[in-house]
Amino acid sequence: MNTVTGAMSALITPFRNGRLDTETYEKLIQRQIRHGMDALVPVGTTGESATLSHSEHKECIEIAVKVCQGTGIKVLAGAGSNSTLEAIDLAKFAEKMGADGILCVTPYYNKPSQEGLFQHYKAVAESVGIPLMLYNVPGRTGVNLETCTIQRLFNEVKNIYGIKEASGSMERIVELNTKIPDFAILSGEDAINYPVLANHGVGVISVIGNLLPDKISALVHKALQGELDESRRINNSLYKINKALFVESNPIPIKAAMYLAGLTPTLEYRLPLVSPSQENMRMIEETLKDYEVKA
């Protein structure tokens, strides 16, 4: 199975006058390709998937696949939902469009049991022939995908190959590595990208990568090549921007930073998300002065 790993950005979704800004979206994807990312993740948490219509969600996937076609850059399409039927529909669409894999967040709000989570992921994975990456972010979903359930999925469902682990817990990373050594683990928390990579992680799905794809690409590739000191140096150099980009709920600060850096022509969110406070906006702007944001 040709899986999706390495340096990835969880793409923002730009809006203009309340609608999807497809022109800017394509430009953002092209910029990611220029700066050495291995794969892109449209319509995840950072892409405001929860407030996109189904047609907008699918359009984002279609655009990402189209722009990446022939570049060698893979697309891991967001296909999560708290409805298994909806997740299957999105997964099938992603496969039809030519996505290289799908990223599926644990069902949120309805808080299924571990057996329910197993049956959900099994149904989604078996509906398609492309790889599926699990996505665990209990702070947002209200449910934790337990290690025993992950192990069962990995053993019983052939196209489930890895996890975006966004619990922020290194203890969890070590536990997964110890109990499921052949399972692909990717950091879903920019603050611990380097520690995850240094503990047999095989990639990251980054928010910072939207703004500084060259840095995230270098951080990941140096680690995977065994140059851990250089990877750690890059990781530590991102400390200030990481603090700034999570001063409010993601993706509020990253969209503000992209706008302030001139990478998007507008700063728009879908309600209930709104712009950062004036204080936080100033802090983001000041922090950007310490970094070179390449075109």
From Swiss-Prot:
<dbReference type="InterPro" id="IPR013785">
    <property type="entry name" value="Aldolase_TIM"/>
</dbReference>
<dbReference type="InterPro" id="IPR005263">
    <property type="entry name" value="DapA"/>
</dbReference>
<dbReference type="InterPro" id="IPR020624">
    <property type="entry name" value="Schiff_base-form_aldolases_CS"/>
</dbReference>
<dbReference type="GO" id="GO:0019877">
    <property type="term" value="P:diaminopimelate biosynthetic process"/>
</dbReference>
<feature type="active site" description="Proton donor/acceptor">
    <location>
        <position position="135"/>
    </location>
</feature>
<comment type="function">
    <text>Catalyzes the condensation of (S)-aspartate-beta-semialdehyde [(S)-ASA] and pyruvate to 4-hydroxy-tetrahydrodipicolinate (HTPA).</text>
</comment>
<keyword id="KW-0456">Lyase</keyword>
<keyword id="KW-0220">Diaminopimelate biosynthesis</keyword>
<dbReference type="GO" id="GO:0005829">
    <property type="term" value="C:cytosol"/>
</dbReference>
<feature type="binding site">
    <location>
        <position position="205"/>
    </location>
    <ligand>
        <name>pyruvate</name>
    </ligand>
</feature>
<protein>
    <recommendedName>
        <fullName>4-hydroxy-tetrahydrodipicolinate synthase</fullName>
        <ecNumber>4.3.3.7</ecNumber>
    </recommendedName>
</protein>
<dbReference type="Pfam" id="PF00701">
    <property type="entry name" value="DHDPS"/>
</dbReference>
<feature type="site" description="Part of a proton relay during catalysis">
    <location>
        <position position="45"/>
    </location>
</feature>
<comment type="pathway">
    <text>Amino-acid biosynthesis; L-lysine biosynthesis via DAP pathway; (S)-tetrahydrodipicolinate from L-aspartate: step 3/4.</text>
</comment>
<dbReference type="GO" id="GO:0009089">
    <property type="term" value="P:lysine biosynthetic process via diaminopimelate"/>
</dbReference>
<feature type="site" description="Part of a proton relay during catalysis">
    <location>
        <position position="109"/>
    </location>
</feature>
<comment type="subunit">
    <text>Homotetramer; dimer of dimers.</text>
</comment>
<dbReference type="InterPro" id="IPR020625">
    <property type="entry name" value="Schiff_base-form_aldolases_AS"/>
</dbReference>
<keyword id="KW-0963">Cytoplasm</keyword>
<comment type="similarity">
    <text>Belongs to the DapA family.</text>
</comment>
<dbReference type="InterPro" id="IPR002220">
    <property type="entry name" value="DapA-like"/>
</dbReference>
<feature type="binding site">
    <location>
        <position position="46"/>
    </location>
    <ligand>
        <name>pyruvate</name>
    </ligand>
</feature>
<feature type="active site" description="Schiff-base intermediate with substrate">
    <location>
        <position position="164"/>
    </location>
</feature>
<dbReference type="GO" id="GO:0008840">
    <property type="term" value="F:4-hydroxy-tetrahydrodipicolinate synthase activity"/>
</dbReference>
<keyword id="KW-0457">Lysine biosynthesis</keyword>
<keyword id="KW-0028">Amino-acid biosynthesis</keyword>
<keyword id="KW-0704">Schiff base</keyword>
